[in-house]
C-alpha cells in the first residue's frame, strides 16, 4: 500500500488545481491510500513540521515529501508513485 499525503490549506490559490490533478492520477489505482492534510489545523501543522514542509500544495509519499509547490505534472506524480512501488 502506498500512502499519499496531500498537504493543502484553504487560502492556497494553487491547491484546488493540485488536488484535481492528484485525484485524476490516482483514480482507479487500488494500492493508494490518500490522506488530506490541512495545514491550517494543529494536526496538519504538526505533520508538516515533522516533514520539514515549506510550502503547499505538497505531496508526500510513504512519509517522504516528493512534490512541493505548483505546478507539477501528472508525469511527475506518476514517477513518484512508481518509485514507491519499486521499494
What are these model-predicted stretches?
Residues 61-87:
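Non-catalytic, surface beta->alpha helical segment in thiol-disulfide oxidoreductase systems
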Residues 49-60:
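Structural micro-motif
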Residues 43-47, 76:
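Short acidic active-site motifs
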Residues 13-14, 40, 66:
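Glycine-/small-residue-rich active-site loops that bind phosphorylated ligands and cofactors
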Residues 1-28:
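Local sequence-structure signature of Cys/Sec-based thiol-disulfide redox active-site neighborhoods
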